[in-house]
């Protein structure tokens, strides 16, 4: 069984037992969370698509860790004007493990 969930403004296709890095969620490590924004649920060749959400569908997950992604470098430059700007950014994430999908 798999599901398409929405969290942090992004959509993820998840299955039971899968590990996933999502946008930061304010929860403690080891805490079980419920993700109720389920866009579709599928099993085998059957697919249930919500309009926009599947009613009654819930994905349960456990928080494994919090961390930060690798640094990306931002470089802005204006030609012939001796203007250069360097900047870096590291995005926070939460690593979760999908425990159960109920539809």
Curated annotation (Swiss-Prot):
InterPro entries (alphabetical): bL21-like (IPR028909), bL21-like_sf (IPR036164), Ribosomal_bL21 (IPR001787), Ribosomal_bL21_CS (IPR018258)
Record GO terms (molecular function): rRNA binding; structural constituent of ribosome
UniProt entry keywords in alphabetical sequence: Ribonucleoprotein, Ribosomal protein, RNA-binding, rRNA-binding
Signal sequence, start to end: none
One of the record's GO cellular component terms: ribonucleoprotein complex
Entry's Gene Ontology BP terms: translation
Similarity comment: family membership: Belongs to the bacterial ribosomal protein bL21 family.
Function: This protein binds to 23S rRNA in the presence of protein L20.
Subunit structure: Part of the 50S ribosomal subunit. Contacts protein L20.
Full protein name: Large ribosomal subunit protein bL21
Taxonomic source organism: Bordetella pertussis (strain Tohama I / ATCC BAA-589 / NCTC 13251)
């Amino acid at each position: 069984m798999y599901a398409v969930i929405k969290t942090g403004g992004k959509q993820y296709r998840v299955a039971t037992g899968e590990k996933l890095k999502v946008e930061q969620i304010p929860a403690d490590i080891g805490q079980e969370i419920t993700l109720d924004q389920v866009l579709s649920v599928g099993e085998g060749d059957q697919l249930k698509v919500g309009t926009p959400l599947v009613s009654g569908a819930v994905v349960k997950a456990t928080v494994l860790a919090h961390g930060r992604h690798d640094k990306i470098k931002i470089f802005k430059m204006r030609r012939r004007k001796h203007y250069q700007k360097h900047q870096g950014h590291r995005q926070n994430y939460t690593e979760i493990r999908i425990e159960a999908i109920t539809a």
